[in-house]
A protein has these predicted regions:
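Stable alpha-helical structural segments in soluble proteins, enriched in small hydrophobic residues
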Residues: 25, 29, 72-87, 370-382
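Short polybasic amphipathic segments
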Residues: 124-136, 199-203, 357-363
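Secondary-structure transition/turn motif
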Residues: 132-142, 172-178, 204-206, 339, ...
Length: 410
């Protein structure tokens, strides 16, 4: 499995210069592809584009391709090739299913002139030595916590440098051996329901845990307030595009969400390992943000939480721990009565009902947290009602006394 060790660095003139060359190469190669397609009706392959760019000069008379290391230039062209192939597949799908799309797909766009684009270094074009990434004789990047990660990253596959509002994100891609899912052990299952006030509701026969999402919601509310203020200032000054302060605001939010999601996913997987859970079921509907309709305010709260990223963090951490993870759609799981084993699906009348916000009244006469009810139904969707884990979860009564975690930073 491939993993990424990430860290950020500040502004660097040498890296900035290389990123601008990368941006110029991207735009130049894309222009040649589009012109060839328009005039000759020919799709240039990666190899054809690579051959052309090796001899194509820029406006200053230099060859962008040769201003970077060969492997870096090749990786930029591969990104273009990947984007073009993705466009082609999307167009073919659009012709068959036009209703899936809001508008007709377009060719990849040019990057902003004078801006910066990613750099990609393979193990052939750079090395890690003495706690530093050596990009050239005059350019190296210190690696934080090198002693902790040195054994993992010494045989890296690729290093990516991504421009940010306040510097650069460095990503070291390395490989680890996959941990096999243990077989022969007694199956123990946990399930997760994702939401807003309760970001994660985790249910198993050993624990019922609610990870509060209110601090994420509060952060997003403050983010929206500041962004609205910056937008009004920008409009008054008649500034086009996004300002530096807005870029910094987006950057800070990105860092905050990434940190929170890593901490939550780590705590979840640690709980699963301690309880010897063998399978985790996660309720997640792909594309649910596009069609969500839970009111204007709730829509904004919901769509500003990148649940797909949290799910991806859980996937790779469970895989490393040898825990099987199943991603399943969660339709009607919040409406059906889990304690009464109501069949999960659409009904004219449901056995249970919402007593008040966050509380579900079961037809068995018991009250249960609404998100806990949803999490248990997500598990039922995958393993069925005859599964011993379902019976044990209900019998042990931990469903009715969930533990709430409001601070993931300690």
């Amino acid at each position: 499995m491939r993993l990424v060790y990430k860290f950020n660095i500040g502004q660097n003139e040498n890296i900035s210069s290389l990123c601008k060359i990368s941006n110029n190469l991207y735009n130049q190669a894309l222009y040649i592809f589009r012109e060839t397609l328009s005039k000759e009706d020919k799709w240039l392959s990666y190899f054809e584009l690579d051959t052309i760019m090796k001899n194509t000069k820029n406006l200053d008379g230099n060859i962008n391709y040769k201003l970077l290391k060969a492997q870096c230039s090749q990786q930029v062209l591969r990104i273009i090739d990947k984007n073009i192939k993705s466009y082609y597949k999307t167009v073919q799908d659009y012709k068959k299913h036009p209703t899936k799309y809001k508008e007709k797909p377009g060719l990849p766009n040019y990057k902003k002139r004078g801006s910066e684009f990613n750099l990609y270094y393979t193990s052939q074009s750079c090395k890690i030595k003495d706690g530093k990434i050596i990009l050239s004789k005059d350019l190296s990047i210190p690696i934080p916590q090198y002693e902790k990660y040195s054994d993992l990253i010494k045989d890296f596959k690729q290093i990516r440098i991504k421009p940010l509002a306040c510097g650069y994100k460095i990503e070291i891609i390395y490989e680890v051996k996959d941990t096999e899912v243990s077989k022969g052990r007694e199956e123990k299952i946990a399930s997760i329901d994702l939401g807003i006030n309760n970001l994660v509701t985790l249910v198993s026969e050993y624990f019922t845990v609610l990870f509060s999402g209110k601090f994420v919601k509060s952060y997003n509310q403050l983010f929206n307030k500041i962004l609205a203020k910056l937008n009004s200032i920008k409009d008054l000054q008649k500034i086009k595009g996004i300002t530096k302060r807005m870029k910094k605001l987006y950057y800070d939010r990105e860092q905050y969400i990434e940190d929170v999601f890593h901490k939550i996913s780590r705590k979840i997987v640690d709980l699963l390992i301690d309880s010897k859970i063998t399978k985790l079921v996660v309720g997640y509907n792909k594309g649910w943000k596009q069609n969500v309709n839970i009111g204007k305010k709730n829509n904004q709260k919901f769509t500003q939480i990148p649940f797909a990223r949290l799910v991806s963090y859980l996937e790779y951490k469970c895989e490393l721990a040898g825990i099987e993870i199943v991603i399943n759609e969660e339709s009607y799981t919040s409406k059906c009565d889990s304690l009464a084993f109501e069949k999960i699906g659409k009904h004219e009348n449901y056995l249970g009902k919402r007593r008040k916000r966050g509380l579900f009244q079961s037809s068995t006469g018991k009250l249960i947290n609404a998100d806990v009810n949803g999490a248990l139904n997500i598990m039922r969707k995958v393993v069925g009602d005859s599964c011993e884990s379902i019976r044990r979860i209900i019998d042990r009564g931990l469903l009715f006394n969930p533990v709430r975690i409001t601070n993931v930073f300690c």
